[in-house]
């Protein structure tokens, strides 16, 4: 299993219940494949430019461990789900040392 992060930009028009239902749908894919996850709600933020004619969006960060082949299915579901404006998934390093972080900064 590997560690991943997916940042989601959701429509500001989604109700809190609709947001939770959407996240439950995504998290169930991870859980079904024996992955572990955390969900961080960053909340409503102003956007630097309009996205689908909206100047605000709701950000959610999913941090999880799963098998790499599950990412394809997760991203497929994200692409066809209404209410998700944008997303980005990245693979995290297994062990990041402080020295490596200093080199990046």
Curated annotation (Swiss-Prot):
Belongs to the bacterial ribosomal protein bS6 family. InterPro entries: Ribosomal_bS6, Ribosomal_bS6_sf, Ribosomal_S6_plastid/chlpt, Transl_elong_EF1B/ribsomal_bS6. GO terms for cellular component: cytoplasm; ribonucleoprotein complex; ribosome. Keywords: Ribonucleoprotein, Ribosomal protein, RNA-binding, rRNA-binding. This is Small ribosomal subunit protein bS6. Gene3D superfamilies: 3.30.70.60. One of its GO terms (biological process) is translation. Pfam families: Ribosomal_S6.
């Amino acid at each position: 299993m590997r560690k991943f992060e997916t940042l989601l930009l959701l429509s500001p028009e989604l109700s809190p219940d609709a947001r939770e239902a959407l996240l439950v749908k995504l998290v169930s894919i991870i859980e079904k494949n024996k992955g572990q996850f955390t969900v961080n709600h960053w909340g409503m933020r102003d956007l630097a430019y309009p996205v689908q004619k909206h100047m605000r969006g709701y950000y959610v960060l999913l941090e999880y461990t799963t098998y790499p082949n599950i990412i394809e299915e997760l991203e497929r579901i994200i692409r066809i789900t209404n209410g998700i404006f944008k997303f980005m998934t990245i693979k995290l390093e297994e062990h990041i040392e402080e020295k490596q972080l200093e080199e990046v900064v």
